[in-house]
Amino acid sequence: MSDHKLVTEWFRYANNDLIVAKHCFNDLYPKQTEIAGYHCQQCAEKALKAFLIFNSMEPPKIHDLRVLCKMCKDINPSFLEIANQCSRLTAYGVATRYPDELVPDINMITLAIIEAQQVYDFCLEKIK
């Protein structure tokens, strides 16, 4: 697969995660906040990794958005603008997958969806 096609696929998968997050939060009752949070983290992770691939870097097999954002910042210092979003979204990658770890409330997921969209849009803009 060409690098361009691979980057496109990473962004497609990231967008799908965002769609799932919004569906779990907006369309299901009761709201599936833990699943929505997980997919917000996944959206941001895949968008950051797409940016790294676009810049000919092999993304590490990690889920810590803070590390991925720092790697992106080393390429483009403007990634500092989304560092706080990445830091907050990191918690949803593991803790929401297990009972009694993190049960996000409605306000937390409302913010997580907004921030996942911000990270996605930011990364996409940086490859144009």
Where are these regions (language model features)?
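Terminal alpha-helical segments
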Residues: M1-K128
